[in-house]
């Protein structure tokens, strides 16, 4: 059952709401415009608030639904977390879009919401505070994601290895943003 759910989570994660909504509304492909990222922040830049919110909600659900299904099927918390990681990997490397996806932050937040809501709340609060202070989405993601690890280590240690793996993937996907942050070239809102 684990492997079936993991594959289905990857396939669900491969649905890129940013790309699909852009195509449906005649907006530019977010991978080719703005920051080049197929995610909610770039959709805000390219297509406005409404499509950005729809992208955010779709990406959150891609992480949340597989975890909830795995939980309902009685899988262990660690298996639920790995299935959530598969959904995020689908978002990062979508089968349907030549393996060029987003950075996985919203999908990871959905996964966390399903696994351990207090960790998701911590991540969202850290993201919002960092974004409010810096107006930089990438920095907010790079701060919020690792902040969940100590809480998970303390409260839900079974989710720590999958979440640590996920954190490394998200930081890796932000490597260009890290270069730009250190060089003082990162885009602000």
Curated annotation (Swiss-Prot):
SUBUNIT field: Probably interacts with PlsX.
Sequence intervals crossing the membrane: 1-21, 51-71, 77-97, 111-131, 151-171
Key words of the record: Cell inner membrane, Cell membrane, Lipid biosynthesis, Lipid metabolism, Membrane, Phospholipid biosynthesis, Phospholipid metabolism, Transferase, Transmembrane, Transmembrane helix
Annotated pathway: Lipid metabolism; phospholipid metabolism
UniProt keyword Cytoplasm present: no
Protein name: Glycerol-3-phosphate acyltransferase
UniProt subcellular location: Cell inner membrane
Described purpose of this protein according to its UniProt entry: Catalyzes the transfer of an acyl group from acyl-phosphate (acyl-PO(4)) to glycerol-3-phosphate (G3P) to form lysophosphatidic acid (LPA). This enzyme utilizes acyl-phosphate as fatty acyl donor, but not acyl-CoA or acyl-ACP.
Membrane topology: Multi-pass membrane protein
């Amino acid at each position: 059952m684990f492997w079936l759910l993991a594959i289905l989570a990857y396939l669900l994660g491969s649905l890129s709401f940013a790309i699909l909504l852009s195509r449906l509304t005649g907006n530019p492909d977010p991978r080719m415009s703005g920051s080049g990222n197929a995610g909610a922040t770039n959709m805000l830049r390219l297509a406005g608030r409404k499509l950005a919110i729809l992208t955010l909600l779709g990406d959150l659900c891609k992480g949340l639904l597989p975890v909830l299904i795995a939980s309902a099927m009685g899988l262990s918390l660690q298996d639920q977390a790995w299935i959530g990681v598969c959904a995020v990997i689908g978002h990062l490397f979508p089968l349907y879009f030549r393996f060029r996806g987003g950075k996985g932050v919203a999908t990871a937040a959905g996964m966390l919401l399903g696994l351990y809501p207090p960790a998701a709340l911590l991540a969202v609060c850290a993201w919002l505070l960092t974004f409010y202070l810096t107006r930089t989405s990438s920095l907010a993601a790079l701060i919020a994601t690792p902040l969940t690890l100590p809480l998970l280590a303390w409260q839900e240690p079974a989710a720590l290895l999958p979440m640590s793996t996920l954190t490394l993937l998200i930081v890796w996907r932000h490597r260009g943003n890290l270069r730009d942050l250190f060089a003082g070239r990162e885009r602000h809102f």
